[in-house]
Design a protein with these regions (language model features):
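Active-site mouth of glycoside hydrolases
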Residues: 29-244, 249
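Substrate-binding cleft of secreted/luminal carbohydrate-active enzymes
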Residues: 298, 312-347
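Glycoside hydrolase catalytic-domain groove-lining segments
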Residues: 222-228, 233-303
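Bacterial Sec-dependent signal peptides at the C-terminal "C-region" and cleavage site
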Residues: 10, 14-28
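A short, well-structured beta->alpha microelement
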Residues: 413-431
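A conserved amphipathic helix/loop scaffold
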Residues: 443-660
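Alpha-helical scaffolding within the catalytic cores
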Residues: 58-62, 170-176, 232-243, 275-284, ...
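Aromatic-rich peripheral "rim/lid" segments of glycoside hydrolase catalytic domains that contact
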Residues: 335-390
Length: 660
């Protein structure tokens, strides 16, 4: 008996050790500094019905064409309703006495169709022969606004129904076990936007992710698990917050379609808001979730929304920006146009029919040629990996209210001003920095008192803190911490016109949903309205500095269309640039007054700095620049010691060599 107990204990320990061995998120296709391009894949002949309308000849030819044009990674989907075709004997009241498989006895305890698994393996074999790695979306029960679940679950919420979850778990274990030996598979994915499959509380969604994630890892502890979700929130109380996904997934992802994300899609596809949206959203996920992130789905929603030329130009900027920010990769939605398909969702909306990189005749679209050209350029470089970018500031976003809009606005203003930020959630410990930007409040509950204290303590310890103030902002001891007194607050909307003393003649106008009138007491006024009201102030607090901008320029950057593109923009970025100077931020490549060009700096091991400059405008620009060092090698673009000349939507990549 004693020996038997020891054997059981040893076996249990080995099982737990196997389950506890987490795969590294910085290996394989997700290696730091690397970058993959590819697509989400549904065979062109049948789209989501590719498994039931199986054409191996189409799969083989199409994947070969994708590989020929530079695709190295595909995200693929075993459609749940096809791979686990559960039917059943239904009793009165809708309960099932027993489950069947296509109205026949189950062929295995998981109810999985083995023929579908064989078809999936064939696709994996084709991918491997073509050098393509696969991310497999396991529970694919939601696709393009439509449910694809086994018929027995069509009237159930599959995220909370115990029976549905039991069968999902069985499917995941069976499928992963059957295919985990295949070398083409790089990662498992929970499924396609599973947070859209039903309404849940946060606890219910946590439990679903934990159950499915555990089933994956118990069966295959060697591969990372990708979130696969869409539209996560900064809010602590949200149904699917970023932090929860960071806890339960190894890799995070974004699906930054400009028309489907709040505050986006307000200008052309090849302008700053749209081009930096994937970068900003992915960095927000990575910084708050604490896991690497990549752009898992991106697209132009077809020629009914964007021309092919604008799409290719915008995608060029998006890819270079994502690579510069170590976002691992970018997958287009999807592989081929599907205008020939005659079932929903392809018959419901034009947006679903022309999303491909390839046309139906296998000819590549400009966006595919651009993605291939990007990969060819990367391979031509003398270095394989881009060193991590340098960051100069921390954008603090609220976690008691929605933080995406002000966070995105602050990020865009920072890039316009000439520095590179990262994100942090207000309700957790803040990363160390000499410069913090606290986003404007949506209401008086946006920031807890401990969150406010943490930010002001950073200033007391020596940092520069910029508070973007709004009518809904409420701060305790503002007089003691910022040298400002609140005169009154009201619900009356206001439009302020003001200018920064350091930039005379550069007037700007900013609205707010309410009015908060501040009186400057012990602080220095750096900008004021035409009526003399302080808008931008500086106050010495402890060893540091507190700056207050009494106008929600972060939110208005997103609300307006005259801030980011065009020859005459609202110069809100001037306030961020002044804050950057006060914070003592020094850049190796300091750009002049050119808000349409973004620079990232990548310190190399030899002491030099690799600089990437991206022109986010669809017009040629000459960007003034001051280099702290000598101009070294130039790998892309027209770069001089004092300026960078950039064609429309183009990038420069060059080296600055230290001379001191």
């Amino acid at each position: 008996m004693a020996m038997k107990r020891i054997a059981i204990l040893v076996a249990s320990a080995l099982m737990l050790a196997s389950f506890g061995a987490q795969p590294s998120a910085e290996e394989g296709i997700f290696t730091q500094g690397e970058f993959f391009v590819g697509c989400n894949y549904w065979a062109k002949n049948a789209g989501m019905y590719m498994w039931s309308q199986w054409r191996p000849d189409v799969v083989e030819k199409e994947i070969g064409e994708l590989a020929k044009h530079g695709v190295t990674v595909m995200r693929v989907f075993p459609l749940w309703s096809d791979f686990q075709p559960l039917t059943g004997v239904c009793a009165a009241g809708g309960s099932y006495k027993r489950f069947l498989q296509n109205n026949r006895p189950l062929s295995n305890p998981a109810g999985v169709d083995d023929e579908m698994v064989r078809r999936f393996r064939f696709m994996c074999d084709v991918a491997e022969r073509n050098g393509i790695k696969l991310i497999v979306g396991l529970v694919t029960g939601w696709m393009s606004g439509r449910q694809f679940v086994p018929v027995v679950f069509e009237e159930k919420n599959v995220l909370i129904d115990a029976e549905a979850i039991m069968w999902q778990t069985r499917f995941v274990k069976y499928f992963v076990s059957a295919l985990k030996d295949h070398k083409a598979i790089a990662a498992w994915d929970y499924g396609n936007e599973c947070n859209c499959m039903g309404r849940t509380s946060q606890a219910q969604f946590y439990n679903w992710m934990d159950i499915i994630g555990s089933a994956i890892r118990l069966t295959d502890p060697t591969r990372p698990v990708v979130s696969g979700m869409h539209g996560l929130s900064t809010e602590e109380s949200a149904r699917a917050p970023i932090r929860l996904n960071g806890e339960l997934a190894d890799i995070l992802c974004t699906h930054p379609y400009s028309f489907y994300v709040s505050g986006c899609g307000k200008e052309a596809f090849n302008t700053m808001r749209t081009e930096l949206h994937p970068t900003a959203e992915s960095l927000l996920y990575a910084d708050l979730g604490g896991k690497p992130c990549f752009v898992e789905e991106i697209g132009n929603l077809g020629t009914s929304c964007n021309s092919e030329s604008r799409t290719a130009a915008g995608m060029r900027c998006t890819m270079f920006s994502a690579w510069a920010n170590d976002l691992k990769g970018c997958l287009w939605w999807c592989n081929s146009d599907q205008e020939v398909l005659d079932f929903p969702p392809y018959t419901d909306t034009a947006n679903e029919r022309e999303l491909g990189m390839l046309r139906q005749d296998y000819s590549p679209k400009p966006v595919m040629l651009e993605m291939h050209a990007f990969q060819k350029f990367r391979k031509s470089l003398p270095f394989r990996k881009l060193p991590p970018r340098r960051t100069d500031a921390v954008i603090v976003v609220p976690e008691r209210s929605a933080g995406w809009i002000p966070g995105f606005g602050a990020y865009l203003l920072a890039r316009q001003a000439g520095f590179d930020p990262r994100f942090a959630g207000a309700e957790m410990e803040l990363p160390e920095s000499g410069f913090y930007i606290m986003c404007s409040s949506e209401n008086n509950m946006s920031y807890s008192y401990p969150a406010q204290k943490r930010v002001f303590e950073k200033a007391r310890a020596g940092a520069t803190v910029l508070i973007v103030y709004a009518a809904g902002s409420r701060f305790t001891a503002l007089r003691q911490q910022a040298g400002l007194e609140v005169d009154y607050s009201s619900r009356s909307p206001i439009e302020r016109t003001f200018e920064l003393f350091a930039s005379p003649g550069r007037k700007m106008s900013c609205g707010d949903s309410g009015t908060c009138r501040l009186i400057a007491r012990e602080c220095e006024v750096l900008a004021k309205t035409t009526a003399g009201e302080p808008v931008f102030t500086r106050f010495k607090y402890g060893k540091g500095t507190v700056l207050v901008c009494n106008s929600p320029i972060d939110r208005q950057t997103i609300a307006r269309t005259d801030v980011l593109t065009g020859t005459q923009v609202q110069p809100y970025y001037l306030l961020f640039r002044e804050a950057m100077k006060i914070a003592g931020v020094k850049r190796v490549a300091a750009k002049g007054d050119c808000p349409w060009v973004g620079l990232t700096e990548h310190p190399a091991a030899d002491g030099s700095t690799i600089v990437m400059a991206i022109n986010f405008e669809p017009r040629a620009l000459s960007c003034p620049v001051a280099l702290d060092g000598r101009l070294g090698r130039v790998w892309r673009g027209e770069v001089k010691a004092d300026r960078i000349d950039l064609p429309p939507n183009e990038c420069a990549l060059f080296e600055v060599v230290r001379t001191k």
